[in-house]
Amino acid sequence: MSKEQEVAVIHPEGERELVVVGGPNQGSTVDTYGGSIHVKWDETAAVTPFGQLAFFIEFLKTAGLWDGWVQECPVTYESPNAPAKTDVLGTILLSVLAGHRRYAHITALRFDGVNPQLLGMTKVCSEDSVRRAFSAVDQAECMAWLTRHLRISYEPLLSESWILDIDSTVKPLYGHQEGAVKGYNPGKPGRPSHVYHTYFAATVRLVLDVEVQAGNQTASSYAQPEFWNYIDSLPAEARPAFVRGDCDWGTERMMAAAEERKILYLFKLKQRSKVKQLIEQAFSRQDWVSAGQGWKGVEAELMLTGWSRQRRVIVLRRRILDERLLAEKKRLADTTPDRQLALGFVEIVKDGPLYEYAVLVTSLPDEILSLGQHYRDRADAENNFDELKNQWGWSGFTTHDLKRCQIMARTIALIYNWWSLFTRLAIPEKHAEAITSRPLLLNAVGKQTTHSGQTTVTVTSMHAKAPRMRSALPAIGSFLATVRNAAEQLTYPQKWLLILSRVFCHFLKGRILGQPQFVPGTG
């Protein structure tokens, strides 16, 4: 054996490459109850799990909502390798629409081969790029940007008579975030949290604004400065018919501020000693009248300690017929003593019936029947929180600083408003929560193909109501095309006016909304 051959044997040319049998390119054979099948992976196909998103993108483009939001975004980059604003905001939009709750969930979107380019994006950003995007931005500038676009989403509606619901919700936290303080947290007592003070347009279920504060600032007194700044920014013709809230908002400071501005209100009162005395006095009255749904009510005047004046109050009561319901409500009252339950007070008379009571304070002139219904309608605010926290991401997207938590809360609220308005074009008679509207109007397998310069997205929906949507979604597209083609001379705010009039045709009965004057539009 020659020396060259000996060297070749002693020092082989590295390890041989392993030949993988049944790798990703070759596929895999799987034994199923339907027989053996061959599974292959295709990493290059232009497919998406959100095949119907193109209709929503057309909605945003026709109204000018997406372009205005991206162009006015205060995020700036100096590095030539930094992502474009369109890519960052587009990634956030896709993630929120998909129902994600954490930045890490963005990874699931990285290989969507259809929708990013429909939004004008060049790529889907990583979770780190999205998380860091707003870290250096000026907070005041960013808040003004988001507040402005939130108002654009609903401003024409304020020319109609509307009700403002105010409420707060707690977001439990599990780290060392700024503002993560122990406070009122009925779901997880002792757990640090943030609190979201939120204003809603009742019935239409749109978010007007949201403010994120530390977990020990759940009281309405912490939210009132920003709330009254918001109210004062509206002209008289755009202010709500009345403001509605639970017992946290029925305070002297809140009611006096409303009276000073000549804004009507309806609040529930905490059942402290003088309120309970009023209930006891009302028990023997004979002038109880129907308040709807089994409730009866009487009217009285009340001036609590610390109040500047006497105010009209309505005492409501409902007979308790189900002993099991009574036991459950008593258990909840014992375990969460600070919680204002529907059973705020139970009057027990020997050998007599049991009643649950609620006391409302109001400046409205309405009769008791209407006031009782008004307050029961406030339960919709709780449904809003349930949807936004459990279906839209208000329970997540948390960072160490409070600023970015506030930015994401308003961003999610804006996207929620956009999607809610879009879904009403398909389902005008009611609000469809995301758990219903996403499978119906968003989720579907979409495959994109291009031939002779024509791009086609083939959609396959597995929903039982897919045939209905196959006619509803193209009808929305036809309407938007009419707005674009027949109203070329109109500005974006004017087009948005027409679109909102169609969105709320069920409420407006065919009327066109009046032109808003108090928020300047883009166009």
Segments (PLM) and residue ranges:
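Acidic/histidine-rich, metal-coordinating catalytic segments
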Residues: 240-250
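Short amphipathic alpha-helical "interface-anchor" segments enriched in bulky aromatics
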Residues: 106, 368-411, 415-419
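Dynamic "connector" segments at or just before major functional cores
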Residues: 2-191, 195-217, 221-236, 423, ...
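An anionic, glycine-rich sequence signature occurring as long contiguous blocks
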Residues: 2-12, 24-35, 39, 264-390, ...
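Structural motif
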Residues: 78-87, 187, 350-351, 399-408
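Short, surface-exposed basic-aromatic patches at helix termini and helix-loop junctions that form
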Residues: 255-264
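Basic, amphipathic alpha-helical segments enriched in Lys/Arg and hydrophobic/aromatic residues
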Residues: 395-458, 462-463
